[in-house]
Protein backbone atom coordinates (compact mmCIF):
# COMPACT_ATOMS: atom_id res chain seq x y z
CA UNK A 1 0.00 0.00 0.00
CA UNK A 2 2.77 2.45 0.93
CA UNK A 3 4.30 2.03 -2.52
CA UNK A 4 0.94 2.37 -4.27
CA UNK A 5 0.37 -1.32 -4.96
CA UNK A 6 -3.01 -3.02 -4.70
CA UNK A 7 -3.01 -5.88 -2.17
CA UNK A 8 -5.31 -8.89 -2.08
CA UNK A 9 -4.86 -10.77 1.15
CA UNK A 10 -6.12 -14.13 2.32
CA UNK A 11 -5.76 -14.79 6.05
CA UNK A 12 -5.65 -18.16 7.75
CA UNK A 13 -9.07 -19.79 7.71
CA UNK A 14 -8.66 -20.03 11.49
CA UNK A 15 -8.74 -16.23 11.96
CA UNK A 16 -11.60 -14.82 9.81
CA UNK A 17 -12.88 -12.35 12.40
CA UNK A 18 -9.44 -10.86 13.02
CA UNK A 19 -8.98 -10.32 9.30
CA UNK A 20 -12.34 -8.56 8.94
CA UNK A 21 -11.48 -6.18 11.79
CA UNK A 22 -8.06 -5.45 10.25
CA UNK A 23 -9.62 -4.83 6.85
CA UNK A 24 -12.10 -2.40 8.42
CA UNK A 25 -9.27 -0.43 10.05
CA UNK A 26 -7.35 -0.34 6.77
CA UNK A 27 -10.50 0.77 4.94
CA UNK A 28 -10.96 3.70 7.31
CA UNK A 29 -7.37 4.85 6.74
CA UNK A 30 -7.81 4.63 2.97
CA UNK A 31 -11.07 6.58 3.12
CA UNK A 32 -9.54 9.35 5.24
CA UNK A 33 -6.80 9.77 2.62
CA UNK A 34 -9.13 9.67 -0.41
CA UNK A 35 -7.70 6.36 -1.63
CA UNK A 36 -10.04 3.86 -3.36
CA UNK A 37 -11.09 1.09 -0.99
CA UNK A 38 -10.14 -1.53 -3.59
CA UNK A 39 -6.46 -0.85 -2.90
CA UNK A 40 -6.87 -3.38 -0.08
CA UNK A 41 -9.03 -6.43 -0.73
CA UNK A 42 -9.80 -9.29 1.64
CA UNK A 43 -10.79 -12.83 0.64
CA UNK A 44 -11.63 -15.33 3.36
CA UNK A 45 -11.63 -19.04 2.58
CA UNK A 46 -9.71 -22.31 2.67
CA UNK A 47 -6.65 -23.51 0.75
CA UNK A 48 -8.54 -23.37 -2.57
CA UNK A 49 -8.47 -19.57 -2.38
CA UNK A 50 -4.71 -19.73 -1.94
CA UNK A 51 -4.38 -21.98 -4.97
CA UNK A 52 -6.45 -19.57 -7.06
CA UNK A 53 -4.32 -16.60 -6.03
CA UNK A 54 -1.09 -18.51 -6.69
CA UNK A 55 -2.16 -19.43 -10.21
CA UNK A 56 -3.59 -16.04 -11.22
CA UNK A 57 -1.47 -14.20 -13.79
CA UNK A 58 -3.06 -10.96 -12.57
CA UNK A 59 -1.01 -11.22 -9.37
CA UNK A 60 2.70 -10.65 -10.14
CA UNK A 61 3.92 -11.19 -6.57
CA UNK A 62 2.63 -13.70 -4.01
CA UNK A 63 3.76 -13.36 -0.39
CA UNK A 64 2.90 -16.50 1.59
CA UNK A 65 3.26 -17.32 5.28
CA UNK A 66 2.79 -20.86 6.55
CA UNK A 67 4.40 -24.29 6.70
CA UNK A 68 7.33 -25.40 4.56
CA UNK A 69 5.02 -27.90 2.85
CA UNK A 70 2.61 -25.12 1.92
CA UNK A 71 5.44 -22.92 0.71
CA UNK A 72 6.72 -25.56 -1.70
CA UNK A 73 3.25 -25.86 -3.23
CA UNK A 74 2.92 -22.08 -3.61
CA UNK A 75 6.41 -21.83 -5.10
CA UNK A 76 5.59 -24.45 -7.73
CA UNK A 77 2.27 -22.83 -8.67
CA UNK A 78 3.70 -19.31 -8.94
CA UNK A 79 6.92 -20.47 -10.59
CA UNK A 80 4.98 -22.30 -13.30
CA UNK A 81 3.77 -18.90 -14.55
CA UNK A 82 7.14 -17.20 -13.88
CA UNK A 83 5.71 -15.09 -11.07
CA UNK A 84 7.56 -13.89 -7.98
CA UNK A 85 7.24 -15.15 -4.40
CA UNK A 86 8.11 -14.09 -0.88
CA UNK A 87 7.96 -17.14 1.37
CA UNK A 88 8.02 -17.01 5.17
CA UNK A 89 7.72 -20.60 6.29
CA UNK A 90 8.69 -22.75 9.27
CA UNK A 91 10.98 -21.42 11.99
CA UNK A 92 13.05 -23.26 14.61
CA UNK A 93 14.57 -20.27 16.31
CA UNK A 94 17.41 -20.45 18.82
CA UNK A 95 19.02 -18.21 21.42
CA UNK A 96 22.71 -18.80 22.19
CA UNK A 97 23.77 -17.91 25.74
CA UNK A 98 27.51 -17.45 26.24
CA UNK A 99 29.47 -17.18 29.52
CA UNK A 100 29.52 -13.39 29.04
CA UNK A 101 25.73 -13.05 28.82
CA UNK A 102 23.66 -10.78 31.05
CA UNK A 103 21.43 -13.25 32.93
CA UNK A 104 18.54 -10.83 33.48
CA UNK A 105 18.43 -9.89 29.81
CA UNK A 106 18.66 -13.57 28.88
CA UNK A 107 15.63 -14.45 30.99
CA UNK A 108 13.55 -11.60 29.59
CA UNK A 109 14.32 -12.46 25.99
CA UNK A 110 13.90 -16.20 26.44
CA UNK A 111 10.64 -16.24 28.39
CA UNK A 112 8.98 -13.65 26.16
CA UNK A 113 10.20 -15.43 23.05
CA UNK A 114 9.16 -18.90 24.18
CA UNK A 115 5.77 -18.29 25.80
CA UNK A 116 4.56 -15.02 24.25
CA UNK A 117 1.42 -15.58 22.15
CA UNK A 118 1.54 -19.11 23.60
CA UNK A 119 4.50 -19.96 21.36
CA UNK A 120 2.48 -19.27 18.21
CA UNK A 121 4.76 -16.77 16.47
CA UNK A 122 6.91 -17.70 13.52
CA UNK A 123 9.79 -16.11 15.46
CA UNK A 124 9.00 -17.78 18.81
CA UNK A 125 12.02 -19.18 20.64
CA UNK A 126 12.15 -22.99 20.29
CA UNK A 127 15.74 -23.74 21.35
CA UNK A 128 18.04 -22.37 24.07
CA UNK A 129 21.73 -23.23 23.58
CA UNK A 130 23.65 -22.47 26.79
CA UNK A 131 27.38 -22.68 27.56
CA UNK A 132 28.27 -25.25 30.20
CA UNK A 133 29.83 -22.60 32.49
CA UNK A 134 26.49 -20.82 33.00
CA UNK A 135 24.16 -23.71 32.19
CA UNK A 136 23.02 -24.54 35.73
CA UNK A 137 22.47 -20.90 36.62
CA UNK A 138 20.39 -20.32 33.48
CA UNK A 139 18.43 -23.53 34.02
CA UNK A 140 17.54 -22.68 37.62
CA UNK A 141 16.50 -19.13 36.72
CA UNK A 142 14.40 -20.37 33.82
CA UNK A 143 12.51 -22.88 35.98
CA UNK A 144 11.87 -20.18 38.57
CA UNK A 145 10.53 -17.82 35.89
CA UNK A 146 8.23 -20.46 34.37
CA UNK A 147 6.76 -21.24 37.79
CA UNK A 148 5.55 -17.63 37.97
CA UNK A 149 3.74 -17.64 34.61
CA UNK A 150 -0.01 -16.97 34.80
CA UNK A 151 -2.20 -18.69 32.22
CA UNK A 152 -5.71 -17.58 31.35
CA UNK A 153 -7.95 -15.17 29.46
CA UNK A 154 -5.65 -13.09 27.22
CA UNK A 155 -7.92 -10.06 27.71
CA UNK A 156 -6.98 -10.08 31.40
CA UNK A 157 -3.79 -8.03 31.74
CA UNK A 158 -2.76 -10.06 34.80
CA UNK A 159 -2.19 -13.13 32.63
CA UNK A 160 0.95 -13.85 30.62
CA UNK A 161 -0.21 -16.70 28.36
CA UNK A 162 -3.47 -17.29 26.52
CA UNK A 163 -4.73 -20.36 24.62
CA UNK A 164 -3.55 -22.24 21.57
CA UNK A 165 -5.68 -21.42 18.56
CA UNK A 166 -7.65 -24.70 18.31
CA UNK A 167 -7.80 -28.40 19.20
CA UNK A 168 -5.56 -29.31 16.27
CA UNK A 169 -2.82 -27.14 17.77
CA UNK A 170 -3.34 -28.86 21.13
CA UNK A 171 -2.89 -32.24 19.44
CA UNK A 172 0.39 -31.04 17.92
CA UNK A 173 1.53 -29.89 21.37
CA UNK A 174 0.67 -33.26 22.93
CA UNK A 175 2.36 -35.13 20.09
CA UNK A 176 5.58 -33.17 20.61
CA UNK A 177 5.51 -34.00 24.33
CA UNK A 178 5.09 -37.68 23.48
CA UNK A 179 8.06 -37.56 21.08
CA UNK A 180 10.26 -35.89 23.70
CA UNK A 181 9.40 -38.72 26.10
CA UNK A 182 10.14 -41.39 23.49
CA UNK A 183 13.45 -39.81 22.48
CA UNK A 184 14.84 -39.43 25.99
CA UNK A 185 14.25 -35.78 26.83
CA UNK A 186 14.02 -34.75 30.49
CA UNK A 187 11.23 -32.42 31.58
CA UNK A 188 12.29 -29.51 33.76
CA UNK A 189 8.82 -28.00 33.55
CA UNK A 190 6.20 -30.51 32.45
CA UNK A 191 3.51 -29.57 29.98
CA UNK A 192 -0.17 -30.40 30.21
CA UNK A 193 -3.54 -29.46 28.78
CA UNK A 194 -5.38 -27.45 31.44
CA UNK A 195 -8.98 -28.11 32.47
CA UNK A 196 -11.60 -26.41 34.64
CA UNK A 197 -13.96 -23.47 34.31
CA UNK A 198 -11.17 -21.05 33.38
CA UNK A 199 -9.98 -23.36 30.60
CA UNK A 200 -13.28 -24.68 29.22
CA UNK A 201 -12.21 -24.35 25.57
CA UNK A 202 -9.71 -27.17 26.03
CA UNK A 203 -7.06 -25.07 24.26
CA UNK A 204 -5.13 -23.79 27.27
CA UNK A 205 -1.79 -25.52 27.81
CA UNK A 206 1.10 -25.17 30.21
CA UNK A 207 4.39 -23.85 28.77
CA UNK A 208 7.04 -26.56 29.09
CA UNK A 209 10.83 -26.89 29.17
CA UNK A 210 12.65 -30.06 28.11
CA UNK A 211 16.35 -30.70 28.69
CA UNK A 212 17.55 -32.42 25.52
CA UNK A 213 20.46 -33.40 23.33
CA UNK A 214 20.54 -31.20 20.25
CA UNK A 215 20.48 -34.24 17.96
CA UNK A 216 16.95 -35.39 18.92
CA UNK A 217 14.61 -35.58 15.92
CA UNK A 218 11.87 -33.57 17.64
CA UNK A 219 14.32 -30.71 18.24
CA UNK A 220 14.80 -30.41 14.49
CA UNK A 221 11.07 -29.92 13.89
CA UNK A 222 8.99 -26.80 14.50
CA UNK A 223 6.28 -27.27 17.12
CA UNK A 224 3.91 -24.28 17.05
CA UNK A 225 3.36 -24.31 20.80
CA UNK A 226 5.11 -23.17 24.02
CA UNK A 227 7.70 -25.94 24.29
CA UNK A 228 11.30 -24.85 24.85
CA UNK A 229 14.25 -27.19 24.27
CA UNK A 230 17.22 -26.49 26.58
CA UNK A 231 20.62 -27.80 25.52
CA UNK A 232 24.27 -27.37 26.48
CA UNK A 233 27.38 -26.50 24.50
CA UNK A 234 31.06 -26.34 25.42
CA UNK A 235 34.11 -24.66 23.94
CA UNK A 236 33.98 -21.50 21.84
CA UNK A 237 31.08 -19.72 20.16
CA UNK A 238 31.55 -21.60 16.88
CA UNK A 239 30.37 -24.81 18.55
CA UNK A 240 27.11 -23.12 19.56
CA UNK A 241 26.64 -21.68 16.07
CA UNK A 242 27.05 -25.15 14.56
CA UNK A 243 24.28 -26.47 16.81
CA UNK A 244 22.04 -23.55 15.92
CA UNK A 245 22.61 -23.93 12.18
CA UNK A 246 22.16 -27.71 11.99
CA UNK A 247 18.36 -27.53 11.64
CA UNK A 248 16.66 -27.14 8.25
CA UNK A 249 14.89 -23.91 9.15
CA UNK A 250 16.52 -20.48 9.21
CA UNK A 251 14.21 -17.65 10.26
CA UNK A 252 15.26 -15.88 13.47
CA UNK A 253 18.20 -16.25 15.85
CA UNK A 254 19.77 -14.44 18.79
CA UNK A 255 22.90 -14.37 20.91
CA UNK A 256 23.19 -13.18 24.50
CA UNK A 257 26.71 -11.90 25.17
CA UNK A 258 28.67 -8.84 26.27
CA UNK A 259 31.68 -10.06 24.29
CA UNK A 260 31.93 -7.95 21.13
CA UNK A 261 34.02 -10.54 19.28
CA UNK A 262 31.37 -13.22 19.90
CA UNK A 263 28.61 -10.90 18.71
CA UNK A 264 30.52 -9.99 15.54
CA UNK A 265 31.24 -13.66 14.84
CA UNK A 266 27.54 -14.47 15.22
CA UNK A 267 26.56 -11.69 12.80
CA UNK A 268 29.25 -12.50 10.24
CA UNK A 269 29.02 -14.70 7.15
CA UNK A 270 30.35 -17.67 9.18
CA UNK A 271 27.86 -17.06 11.98
CA UNK A 272 24.07 -17.42 12.09
CA UNK A 273 22.60 -18.74 8.84
CA UNK A 274 19.16 -17.26 9.58
CA UNK A 275 17.48 -14.34 7.85
CA UNK A 276 17.24 -12.49 11.17
CA UNK A 277 20.08 -12.28 13.71
CA UNK A 278 19.70 -10.42 17.01
CA UNK A 279 22.18 -9.45 19.73
CA UNK A 280 21.05 -9.22 23.37
CA UNK A 281 17.36 -9.41 22.53
CA UNK A 282 15.20 -12.47 21.93
CA UNK A 283 14.19 -14.04 18.63
CA UNK A 284 10.69 -12.57 18.72
CA UNK A 285 9.27 -9.06 18.77
CA UNK A 286 12.06 -6.83 17.49
CA UNK A 287 11.84 -7.65 13.80
CA UNK A 288 8.83 -5.62 12.68
CA UNK A 289 10.84 -2.61 11.54
CA UNK A 290 13.37 -4.55 9.49
CA UNK A 291 13.59 -6.61 6.32
CA UNK A 292 11.73 -9.74 7.41
CA UNK A 293 12.36 -13.22 6.07
CA UNK A 294 14.41 -16.38 6.35
CA UNK A 295 16.75 -18.82 4.65
CA UNK A 296 16.85 -22.56 3.93
CA UNK A 297 13.48 -24.28 4.50
CA UNK A 298 12.05 -21.02 5.83
CA UNK A 299 11.83 -19.86 2.23
CA UNK A 300 13.28 -16.70 0.77
CA UNK A 301 12.69 -13.04 0.00
CA UNK A 302 12.17 -10.21 2.46
CA UNK A 303 9.04 -8.41 3.58
CA UNK A 304 9.75 -4.64 3.52
CA UNK A 305 12.80 -5.45 1.40
CA UNK A 306 16.00 -3.43 1.27
CA UNK A 307 14.12 -0.19 2.06
CA UNK A 308 13.74 -1.38 5.66
Question: What residue ranges belong to the model's regions?
Answer:
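Rossmann-like NAD(P) dinucleotide-binding subdomain of oxidoreductase/dehydrogenase enzymes
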Residues: 1-105
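Conserved residues at the C-terminal ends of beta-strands
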Residues: 46, 65, 113, 257, ...
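ALDH superfamily catalytic-core signature
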Residues: 28, 61, 69-214, 238, ...
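Gly/Ser/Thr-rich beta-alpha loop segments that engage phosphate groups in nucleotides
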Residues: 6, 47, 68-69, 73, ...
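Active-site-adjacent beta-strand anchor residues
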Residues: 9-12, 43, 64, 96, ...
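Conserved C-terminal structural/oligomerization subdomain of aldehyde/semialdehyde dehydrogenase
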Residues: 35, 59, 96, 150, ...
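Residue-level signal for alpha-helix termini/capping positions
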Residues: 31, 54-55, 79, 115, ...
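Structured helix-beta-strand junction loops
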Residues: 3, 56, 81, 176, ...
Amino acid sequence: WVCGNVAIWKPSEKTPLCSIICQKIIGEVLKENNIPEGVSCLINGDYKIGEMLSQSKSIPLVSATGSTRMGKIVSEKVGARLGKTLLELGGNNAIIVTPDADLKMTMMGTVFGAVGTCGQRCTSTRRLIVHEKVYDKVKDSLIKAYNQIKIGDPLDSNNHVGPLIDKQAVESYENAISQVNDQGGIWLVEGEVLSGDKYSSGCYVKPAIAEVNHSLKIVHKETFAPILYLMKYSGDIQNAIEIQNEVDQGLSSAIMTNNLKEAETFLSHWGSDCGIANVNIGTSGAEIGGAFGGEKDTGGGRESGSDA
